[in-house]
């Protein structure tokens, strides 16, 4: 009798579990969000979380997903890869989330992706650009461009638009994002007839770059690539100018933070970086997002706020189109996403689950203003020329 009762209880438990995962069962859509709310990339994590929360609130206010409200389970990984893995493990083993959004940094997404993949829970990163992220499995997606595309755009811009023939590069050897970009930038610049005359390395959090910059200055580069994060780039720019290095600095989307100019100041004038969008784009869709974000958070949204907002909306749209809350059904709906009208551009996932979308090249001008120097599509063709200068984005407030 006891065995029969236990069997019945087990069967009941399984049926209830199925009911909760079926589109008609349960009353919440549970989405795990892991971001760097503190630590070295806190600015990125905070603005990304802001974008995700705003997207969820908009969908919930409109009735939710197929009548169900979205429940965000937001966790701070403290900018640490091992903590990111721990959080995602909890998401899939204890919280039983239906989908996962995160992380901002490639190294942390790479640490977490195998866990989501093994659990067959779809994970969508809004801003991890290292190609290795989506290679972790067919449940892993990204809604941003990838480093080979971004790196090629950076190198092409230096060679074609700036006319540089000699280049040097500063790379964070312990950062997947930085090393991934370095390889593509160097290879593309060389392929286009340029010469890489010097390479120097540093580690995130370093304060003194004088030895590396002294070496690079002696190589007489016409441009210096710095594929790193804003907190290091600002210091590198200041110390480069102090050493009399006047050539343009060029980097990637890791530069995008108001803290960049707060750290580097006028040393950044005449520098350039690739990005996912511009908050000064006149597209009504972009301006609505910017105005809504400003009204809610009191600041202009940076690119990672926009990519995270898009990622959340894309995930919610896929869940709506899925036949159930089963992970495979959501994964299949995500993979079928085509021309989703995001604020960072129309998004389509290719066969590698990477987003196909445009890139903008931002120029930093005196007074901390930004302008769009040109737009580049995934094939690398220039789409548009200069746009009017506009103020740099303000720092995002801490999320409550």
Predicted regions and their residues:
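Beta-alpha junction/loop-to-helix N-cap segments that form part of ligand/metal-binding clefts
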Residues: 21-23, 27-28, 43-48, 58, ...
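Segments of small-molecule ligand-sensing domains
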Residues: 295-305, 316-370, 392, 397-400
């Amino acid at each position: 009798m006891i065995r029969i009762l236990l069997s019945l209880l087990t069967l009941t438990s399984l049926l209830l579990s199925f009911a909760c995962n079926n589109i008609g069962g349960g009353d919440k859509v549970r989405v795990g969000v892991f971001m760097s709310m503190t630590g070295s990339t806190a600015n990125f994590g905070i603005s990304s979380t802001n974008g995700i929360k705003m997207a969820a609130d908009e969908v919930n206010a409109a009735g939710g997903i197929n009548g169900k409200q979205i429940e965000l389970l937001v966790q701070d990984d403290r900018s640490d890869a091992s903590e990111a893995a721990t959080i995602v493990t909890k998401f899939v083993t204890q919280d039983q989330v239906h989908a996962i959004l995160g992380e901002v940094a490639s190294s942390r997404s790479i640490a977490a992706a195998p866990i989501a993949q093994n659990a067959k829970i779809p994970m969508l990163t809004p801003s991890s650009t290292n190609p290795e992220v989506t290679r972790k499995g067919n449940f892993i997606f990204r809604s941003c461009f990838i480093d080979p595309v971004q790196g090629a755009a950076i190198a092409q811009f230096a060679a074609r638009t700036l006319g540089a023939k000699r280049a040097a590069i500063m790379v964070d050897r312990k950062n997947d994002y930085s090393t991934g970009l370095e390889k593509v930038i160097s290879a593309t610049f060389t392929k286009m007839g340029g010469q890489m005359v010097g390479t120097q390395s540093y580690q995130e959090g370093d304060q003194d770059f004088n030895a590396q910059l002294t070496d690079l200055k002696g190589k007489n580069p016409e441009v210096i690539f710095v594929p790193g994060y804003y907190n290091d780039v600002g210091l590198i720019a200041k110390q480069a100018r102090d050493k009399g290095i006047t050539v343009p600095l060029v980097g990637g989307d890791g530069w995008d933070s108001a803290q960049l100019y707060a750290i580097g100041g006028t040393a950044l004038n005449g520098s350039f970086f690739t990005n996912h969008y511009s908050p000064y784009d006149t597209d009504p869709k972009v301006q609505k997002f910017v105005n809504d974000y400003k009204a809610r958070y009191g600041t202009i949204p940076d690119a990672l706020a926009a990519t995270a907002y898009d990622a959340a909306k894309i995930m919610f749209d896929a869940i709506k189109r899925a036949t159930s809350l089963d992970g495979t059904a959501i994964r299949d709906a995500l993979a079928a996403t085509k021309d989703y009208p995001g604020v960072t551009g129309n998004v389509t996932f290719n066969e590698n689950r990477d987003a196909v979308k445009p890139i903008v090249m931002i120029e930093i001008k005196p007074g901390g203003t930004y302008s769009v120097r040109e737009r580049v599509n995934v094939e690398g063709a220039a789409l548009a020329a200069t746009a009017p200068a506009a103020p740099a984005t303000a720092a995002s407030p801490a999320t409550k």
